[in-house]
């Protein structure tokens, strides 16, 4: 008889077999044959391990519940290691050594034994009675907590106890000797020597293949196992880590009969959280991971909830996907090793002549690692799933592992997407989940992403950070609430967003949001026929997914902004990084918005009501106008500069005391020269190679903006009465067209910023970042947009794809023994090697490393066609903007304006600016109405 795991009590119940997916052709092969247990009573219940291996239950005479049986420890004083390998003879290291003796670096002194803390003795590992033996299937795995059949040794306690932490580590651990200097490979010479020793001392073992797949349970170091385990932890769940060498494509993961612990345990998953990373450092990983642990701990405190409670951690799975084994930061692997979800020496690059696509580690951990390297135990267990991709195939492929490989097995209710480095606040993940629970038609949601300004706002001294802080704040106050009212948010940021799994799932015919989302991954493959338009569109793949959810055929999903969910993120603090990031954002958003315009008719094939279909169509028209204004923003900004300054100096009163005409001529030519400098740099230079030139252009554009604001203020000042008698007739003031247009345009922008910020009780960015944003505004238009258009051919993320296979980990060779398929693998067997490497990883994290500048490698495939397309678009873009400038600055147009529009009250104000100002007023009024409606709806819980 085989068993499956009950959803309610997490206890194994007889059910005639596992509940395997319907596409598994032969579920009976997962059952445990009775022949395995020859020599034992057939009445003894047998419990399958999460790894799927055959187990030999310990004999017992005690009466047990036939529905659930947990093997009891024997009365012998032998350790788990002794039970597996036999009791070795005493050796010179019978009583062990202090960790400092194991990892002592150059110049470190040995602490006398009399001053050392008492350590538990452990047996010598100089001899193993069965080191040269092969492991038959009948010798494997007494119970999940004794799955030592993979060849590794059960570690024993050789370290001082660690602190108990609620969910944040504290710096209360006693200091250790400083390790030797960090090498260029991300570790000390001691760590690499220990790793080399561990690899060299591996022993060939024979492991049963599970449906042709290499899946094994690896014991974790004793320092990872807490003395007090969290509520609901199954026996053995924290004693071993599960490793699977996935040799298939993500779409074939379940079809290849791979499985996950949550599926085998029968746990229902409400939240499936993914953290994607490339080569980010350990500090960024810990910032995000510790924040997620805090959020999960908060869920366990909600004892009055129908969904959450003390054992809520069992309903949350945290998945970390690293994009490329050879590019991941070594210190990141050390962090995961300390948490028990990664181990050196067990990965294989080939299994039975098939290339490994991803290394999957599963472990339930209570270890918390601080950003300073301190290690402690949290009160809440965390179900961790670490997917280390063998090759660098970019972020979309990482999400394909998450959604298409793991999702069908875990079947979550809500999926949360995070980028490593994003820090959700204490209750943010719950706030996102509550939105889905409260509104059954919500298919996707996002929270507020704010710029990390540092302690006491110290990063705001950098004008670049301050400008982005203001931009982020106003987007969260005006844009996202406005779009949320309509139910279609143009972008759910991949750095912090959530999706209902049913909403993103494809239809039965394979079409749907996820199919459209992952189409972008295939476009950059060798031999792909995708156009440069499509490849630029998928630079903003999160916009594509958001649009596809809303227009899903015969469905009525909508998107919502959750103000209460907040997450902080680092923003670029240097000019090259800022320009490179915005190049991806602008190109992706422009082409994704164009795609949404072209496919807007799909709104009418969805399942939305007629009223929402009309409102979504109206939103599409609004987005079309915004796209048009963005396209002509270079010419519009220059014309505003030209006419405002020229009109202010043409009157009887010169704002520059008679030097206005000379100043205007100089800065007009400077402005035009700066545009051509930016154009030349954008066509031939990377921002990293032209840092000083771009910085100089930003400074000069800020000077031009300062002159523009001064002249605008001077013009308004000249139009208002200067005496108390003049203010008695206020109606005459509104008859002055110049005053009305300038005043309304200023109120529609800057006044709107202030009023809406006060309504949302967030006015502080107006004080700390508003001026910096105003001075950076011309650079947003003239530098970022021109650079983005000049680099349409570059559809890279700054990372280089890796399509080659590696053979540096060793392979698992297929052999047969007693008619069963086995894999010969080299595995660690020396306990002191595993413990010493764990200790050294723990020690090295306490030493900060110097950050290195990242080097970007541009994409070169299809370079000729891409650059030709780039040239044509740049000519069209600059040509249309120059045509507008030449038309409205020509003498013919100026004379026509003077003869038809100029009068005593309007000075020399240009009608083109009138159109621009009223358009800005109308669009701003719509945004304000949207943010106001969002507040009203929020008050009534909608």
UniProtKB/Swiss-Prot annotation:
It is an enzyme of class 2 (transferase). It catalyses: [(1->4)-N-acetyl-beta-D-glucosaminyl](n) + UDP-N-acetyl-alpha-D-glucosamine = [(1->4)-N-acetyl-beta-D-glucosaminyl](n+1) + UDP + H(+). This is Chitin synthase 2. GO terms for cellular component: cell septum; plasma membrane. Residues 71-80 have a biased composition (Polar residues). Disruption phenotype: Abnormal capsular morphology: abnormal fiber distribution, decreases capsular diameter. Decreases extracellular vesicle secretion. Belongs to the chitin synthase family. Class III subfamily. Residues 1-13 have a biased composition (Basic and acidic residues). The keyword Transmembrane helix applies. It is a multi-pass membrane protein. Induction: Induced by the antifungal agent caspofungin. Polymerizes chitin, a structural polymer of the cell wall and septum, by transferring the sugar moiety of UDP-GlcNAc to the non-reducing end of the growing chitin polymer. The lineage of its organism: Eukaryota, Fungi, Dikarya, Basidiomycota, Agaricomycotina. Its EC number is 2.4.1.16. It is found in: Cell membrane. The chain crosses the membrane at residues 590-610, 625-645, 663-683, 696-716, 739-759, 770-790, 873-893, 916-936. The gene is CHS2. One of its GO terms (biological process) is cell wall organization. The keyword Transferase applies. Its main location: membrane. Residues 18-33 have a biased composition (Low complexity). Keywords: Cell membrane, Cell wall biogenesis/degradation, Glycoprotein, Glycosyltransferase, Membrane, Transferase, Transmembrane, Transmembrane helix. One of its GO terms (molecular function) is chitin synthase activity. Disulfide bonds: none annotated. Glycans are attached at residues 23, 587, 736, 803.
